[in-house]
């Protein structure tokens, strides 16, 4: 099925037209010294700029909607998009208005006062409980109010651009329902993300290596099941590797283990023994703390008193050897607690192996989420990878073969 693109909309002409853009601006935000907002990783804001800039530059009246965190359907000053709006304005090189509400009197007044090329950012869409409601009627009611901001009282004069790939797996008012009311288009970011994932699923060059990390097997069971049948190698690290080690009957000490998933991991190991690669050694510590004393131990000899917080150097070498031969690589999830410098070497080592493979011609995709955060936290070059996704959960669900509501609704 065809999806209309941002270029299609620009070709139709947007000068003087209201355009609602659903962006993904969910960035890590903390307040320093009480009131000074600090965005530690502006990657998603940066990725949102090209679509917004193209529309504003073509004379559209651009209204951006996005979420930040999980405010549980009510206003939370610490989750206001005001600091994000300031950062967006700096990147765009123009003033970005920030409404004091989602679809209330301030948003409506500001929308009515927009001139060609202006940009307005609505307040955190999740301040309105209807955004994430399971009730179709409630979501549709909010979607109508959003549509009216760009299309007037009838909501028919504007357009909708979906450019928040990180939320396209959610059936939410600003992602799905509003697209049923307005002419809809995929923004440049969403179109690029979908194209990359189609390469991973439809035209993968082999050998195909998948690297999965993170803490819980249950979070990635479906994608493990799916990719184990498609990949030539499935490298598993992070906290979830300990459930696999436990499934082999090995001692894991105080490491994170999902006991209810042990039998499932055993089945996976039996079925895909030639595909799955587990760590050979572990960086173990006394407790989950940045300054906890650590030692490198064999993966089959983790002491009862210790917990694994990273993969060891021999594991990095083994995984790097697998990756060095790959032509296609998908990575989702860190190999250890990269936020603690003492336990970041595994993630860094595997990431550098992916970069080296990319330099040799491999097509590499970082699957968003914590993996993308690790790339930036460890000061690794974004351009060392073929593509860094802005949507961890959306990427995984696409690779599982699930229908993504925010993509499905765009298809004509």
UniProtKB/Swiss-Prot annotation:
| Binding residues annotated for ATP, in chain numbering | 220, 308, 339, 368-371
GO CC, alphabetical: cytosol
Q: Which reaction does it catalyse?
A: (2R)-3-phosphoglycerate + ATP = (2R)-3-phospho-glyceroyl phosphate + ADP
Q: What is its EC number?
A: 2.7.2.3
Q: Which class of enzymes does this protein belong to?
A: transferase
Which residues are recorded as binding substrate? 24-26, 44, 67-70, 126, 170
Q: In which pathway does it act?
A: Carbohydrate degradation; glycolysis; pyruvate from D-glyceraldehyde 3-phosphate: step 2/5
Entry-linked CDD domains: Phosphoglycerate_kinase
- Alphabetized InterPro entries for the sequence: Phosphoglycerate_kinase, Phosphoglycerate_kinase_CS, Phosphoglycerate_kinase_N, Phosphoglycerate_kinase_sf
Q: Provide this UniProt record's keywords sorted from A to Z.
A: ATP-binding, Cytoplasm, Glycolysis, Kinase, Nucleotide-binding, Transferase
Q: Cellular location of this protein?
A: Cytoplasm
Oligomeric and partner information:
Monomer.
UniProt-recorded name of the protein: Phosphoglycerate kinase
Q: What is the lineage of its organism?
A: Bacteria, Bacillati, Actinomycetota, Actinomycetes, Mycobacteriales
């Amino acid at each position: 099925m065809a999806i209309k693109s941002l270029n299609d909309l620009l070709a139709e002409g947007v000068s003087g037209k209201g355009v609602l853009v659903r962006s993904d601006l969910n960035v890590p935000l903390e307040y320093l010294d009480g009131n000074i907002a600090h965005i530690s990783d502006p990657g998603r804001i940066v990725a949102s700029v090209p679509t917004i800039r193209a529309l504003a530059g073509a004379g559209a009246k651009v209204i951006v909607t996005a979420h930040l965190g999980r405010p549980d359907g009510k206003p939370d000053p610490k989750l206001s998009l005001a600091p994000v709006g300031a950062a967006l304005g700096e990147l765009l090189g123009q003033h970005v208005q920030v409404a004091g509400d989602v679809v209330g009197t301030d948003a409506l007044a500001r929308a009515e006062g927009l001139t060609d090329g202006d940009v307005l950012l609505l307040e955190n869409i999740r301040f309105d409980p209807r955004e994430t409601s399971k009730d179709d009627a409630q979501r549709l009611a909010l979607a109508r109010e959003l549509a009216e901001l760009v299309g007037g009282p009838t909501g028919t004069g504007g357009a909708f651009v979906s450019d928040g790939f990180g939320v396209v797996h959610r059936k939410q008012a600003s992602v799905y329902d509003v697209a049923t009311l307005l002419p809809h288009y995929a923004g440049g970011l969403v179109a690029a993300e979908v194209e990359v994932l189609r390469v991973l699923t439809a035209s993968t060059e082999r050998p195909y290596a998948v690297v999965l990390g993170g803490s819980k097997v249950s979070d990635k069971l479906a994608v493990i099941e799916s990719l184990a049948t498609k990949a030539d190698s499935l490298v598993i690290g992070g906290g979830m590797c300990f459930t696999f080690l436990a499934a082999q009957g090995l001692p894991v000490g105080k490491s994170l283990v999902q006991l209810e998933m042990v039998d499932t991991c055993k089945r996976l190991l039996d079925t895909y023994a030639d595909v799955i690669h587990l760590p050979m050694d572990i960086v173990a510590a006394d407790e989950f703390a940045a300054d906890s004393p650590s030692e490198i131990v064999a993966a089959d000899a983790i002491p009862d008193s210790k917990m694994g917080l990273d993969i060891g150097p021999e594991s990095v070498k083994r995984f790097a050897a697998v990756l060095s031969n790959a032509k296609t690589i998908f990575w989702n999830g860190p190999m250890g607690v990269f936020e603690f410098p003492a336990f970041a070497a595994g993630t860094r080592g595997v990431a550098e192996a992916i970069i080296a493979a990319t330099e040799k011609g491999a097509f590499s995709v970082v699957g968003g989420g914590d993996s993308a955060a690790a790339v930036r936290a460890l000061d690794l070059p974004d351009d060392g990878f073929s593509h860094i996704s802005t949507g961890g959960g959306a990427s995984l669900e696409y690779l599982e073969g699930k229908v993504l509501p925010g993509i499905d609704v765009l298809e004509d």
